[in-house]
Amino acid sequence: HAVIGYRDNDIAGVLENTVFLELLRRGFSVNIGKQDVAEVDFVANRADDRLYIQVCYILTPENTDREFAPLEAISDNYEKLVLSTDTLLRVNRGGIRQKNIIDFLLEH
């Protein structure tokens, strides 16, 4: 977003940047994951630890499959998260957890 500039209506992009910077602060190397046509927002690696993260503004019935599907396609046992601004929603789908982005940022 530093290259294309900031747009007020790009909340999802701002959230992604925030998560990216937090992962770097925690000592992870961060990449984007791609498997076939599915893309994972972040693949974070640190020593023997790996974390897969999807970031979205709000989980809705319309976008839940889109956010979880790329993580479901990964067959290893590393932690997989969908981060959103939802505060009451707590989805656990096949071991993939939805977590509030603020709660994630306040960890560690």
Identify the residue ranges that each predicted region occupies.
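A cross-kingdom feature that marks ATP-driven nucleic-acid transaction machinery
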Residues: 1-108
